[in-house]
Amino acid sequence: MEPVDPRLEPWKHPGSQPKTACTTCYCKKCCFHCQVCFTKKALGISYGRKKRRQRRRAPEDSQTHQVSLPKQPAPQFRGDPTGPKESKKKVERETETHPVD
Protein backbone atom coordinates (compact mmCIF):
# COMPACT_ATOMS: atom_id res chain seq x y z
CA MET A 1 0.00 0.00 0.00
CA GLU A 2 1.32 3.40 -0.96
CA PRO A 3 1.88 5.99 1.75
CA VAL A 4 -0.70 8.76 1.76
CA ASP A 5 0.15 12.41 2.30
CA PRO A 6 -1.08 13.21 5.85
CA ARG A 7 -1.92 16.78 4.83
CA LEU A 8 -4.67 15.56 2.46
CA GLU A 9 -8.23 15.30 3.69
CA PRO A 10 -9.58 11.71 3.76
CA TRP A 11 -12.04 12.36 0.93
CA LYS A 12 -9.21 13.57 -1.31
CA HIS A 13 -7.03 10.48 -0.89
CA PRO A 14 -6.11 8.74 -4.15
CA GLY A 15 -8.62 6.05 -5.00
CA SER A 16 -11.28 7.47 -2.74
CA GLN A 17 -13.26 8.87 -5.67
CA PRO A 18 -14.04 7.22 -9.01
CA LYS A 19 -12.29 8.46 -12.13
CA THR A 20 -15.56 9.17 -13.92
CA ALA A 21 -18.32 11.48 -12.74
CA CYS A 22 -21.60 10.21 -11.36
CA THR A 23 -24.54 10.18 -13.76
CA THR A 24 -28.32 10.06 -13.45
CA CYS A 25 -28.47 6.68 -15.23
CA TYR A 26 -29.96 3.78 -13.26
CA CYS A 27 -28.36 0.88 -15.11
CA LYS A 28 -26.54 -1.81 -13.11
CA LYS A 29 -23.12 -0.42 -13.99
CA CYS A 30 -24.05 3.10 -12.88
CA CYS A 31 -25.78 1.88 -9.71
CA PHE A 32 -22.53 0.26 -8.56
CA HIS A 33 -20.33 3.14 -9.78
CA CYS A 34 -19.41 4.36 -6.29
CA GLN A 35 -20.74 4.25 -2.75
CA VAL A 36 -22.83 7.38 -3.25
CA CYS A 37 -24.42 6.00 -6.43
CA PHE A 38 -25.11 2.71 -4.67
CA THR A 39 -26.95 4.31 -1.76
CA LYS A 40 -28.89 6.75 -3.94
CA LYS A 41 -29.70 4.59 -6.95
CA ALA A 42 -29.55 0.95 -5.84
CA LEU A 43 -30.88 1.39 -2.30
CA GLY A 44 -33.00 4.48 -3.01
CA ILE A 45 -31.81 6.38 0.06
CA SER A 46 -31.57 10.15 -0.18
CA TYR A 47 -31.40 12.52 2.74
CA GLY A 48 -32.16 15.71 0.83
CA ARG A 49 -35.34 17.73 0.88
CA LYS A 50 -38.39 15.99 -0.45
CA LYS A 51 -39.86 17.65 -3.50
CA ARG A 52 -43.54 18.50 -3.38
CA ARG A 53 -45.55 16.71 -5.99
CA GLN A 54 -47.83 18.95 -7.98
CA ARG A 55 -51.44 17.89 -8.22
CA ARG A 56 -52.61 16.80 -11.60
CA ARG A 57 -54.85 19.35 -13.18
CA ALA A 58 -57.94 18.24 -15.03
CA PRO A 59 -58.13 19.18 -18.69
CA GLU A 60 -60.12 22.33 -19.40
CA ASP A 61 -62.81 20.52 -21.41
CA SER A 62 -63.75 18.03 -18.67
CA GLN A 63 -66.53 20.02 -16.97
CA THR A 64 -68.96 17.08 -17.16
CA HIS A 65 -67.55 15.58 -13.96
CA GLN A 66 -68.87 18.51 -11.97
CA VAL A 67 -72.38 18.15 -13.39
CA SER A 68 -72.66 14.41 -12.78
CA LEU A 69 -72.14 14.69 -9.01
CA PRO A 70 -75.46 14.38 -7.11
CA LYS A 71 -76.27 17.10 -4.62
CA GLN A 72 -76.20 16.08 -0.99
CA PRO A 73 -79.41 16.47 1.06
CA ALA A 74 -79.64 19.26 3.61
CA PRO A 75 -78.50 18.28 7.10
CA GLN A 76 -81.19 17.12 9.52
CA PHE A 77 -81.08 18.93 12.85
CA ARG A 78 -81.93 17.02 16.00
CA GLY A 79 -83.92 18.35 18.88
CA ASP A 80 -86.82 20.81 18.83
CA PRO A 81 -87.78 21.41 15.17
CA THR A 82 -89.41 24.77 16.02
CA GLY A 83 -86.10 26.27 17.05
CA PRO A 84 -84.75 27.73 20.28
CA LYS A 85 -86.77 31.00 20.18
CA GLU A 86 -90.18 29.33 20.20
CA SER A 87 -89.20 26.89 22.94
CA LYS A 88 -88.21 29.84 25.16
CA LYS A 89 -91.61 31.42 24.52
CA LYS A 90 -93.32 28.18 25.58
CA VAL A 91 -91.38 28.16 28.85
CA GLU A 92 -92.28 31.81 29.49
CA ARG A 93 -96.00 31.10 28.90
CA GLU A 94 -95.92 28.12 31.27
CA THR A 95 -94.25 30.15 34.02
CA GLU A 96 -96.81 32.96 33.59
CA THR A 97 -99.77 30.58 33.91
CA HIS A 98 -98.27 28.68 36.87
CA PRO A 99 -96.57 31.23 39.13
CA VAL A 100 -94.52 29.71 41.91
CA ASP A 101 -95.17 31.39 45.32
Swiss-Prot record:
Indicate the annotated site residue(s) for Essential for Tat translocation through the endosomal membrane.
11
Q: Which GO terms describe its molecular function?
A: actinin binding; cyclin binding; metal ion binding; protein domain specific binding; protein serine/threonine phosphatase inhibitor activity; RNA-binding transcription regulator activity; trans-activation response element binding
Q: Quote the subcellular location field of this record.
A: Host nucleus, Host nucleolus; Host cytoplasm; Secreted
The segment annotated Core runs over 38-48
Question: Region Cysteine-rich: what ranges?
Answer: 22-37
* Residues at which Zn(2+) 1 binds: 22, 33-34, 37
* Subunit relationships: Interacts with host CCNT1. Associates with the P-TEFb complex composed at least of Tat, P-TEFb (CDK9 and CCNT1), TAR RNA, RNA Pol II. Recruits the HATs CREBBP, TAF1/TFIID, EP300, PCAF and GCN5L2. Interacts with host KAT5/Tip60; this interaction targets the latter to degradation. Interacts with the host deacetylase SIRT1. Interacts with host capping enzyme RNGTT; this interaction stimulates RNGTT. Binds to host KDR, and to the host integrins ITGAV/ITGB3 and ITGA5/ITGB1. Interacts with host KPNB1/importin beta-1 without previous binding to KPNA1/importin alpha-1. Interacts with EIF2AK2.
What is this protein's function per UniProt?
Transcriptional activator that increases RNA Pol II processivity, thereby increasing the level of full-length viral transcripts. Recognizes a hairpin structure at the 5'-LTR of the nascent viral mRNAs referred to as the transactivation responsive RNA element (TAR) and recruits the cyclin T1-CDK9 complex (P-TEFb complex) that will in turn hyperphosphorylate the RNA polymerase II to allow efficient elongation. The CDK9 component of P-TEFb and other Tat-activated kinases hyperphosphorylate the C-terminus of RNA Pol II that becomes stabilized and much more processive. Extracellular circulating Tat can be endocytosed by surrounding uninfected cells via the binding to several surface receptors such as CD26, CXCR4, heparan sulfate proteoglycans (HSPG) or LDLR. Neurons are rarely infected, but they internalize Tat via their LDLR. Through its interaction with nuclear HATs, Tat is potentially able to control the acetylation-dependent cellular gene expression. Modulates the expression of many cellular genes involved in cell survival, proliferation or in coding for cytokines or cytokine receptors. Tat plays a role in T-cell and neurons apoptosis.
Protein name stated in the entry: Protein Tat
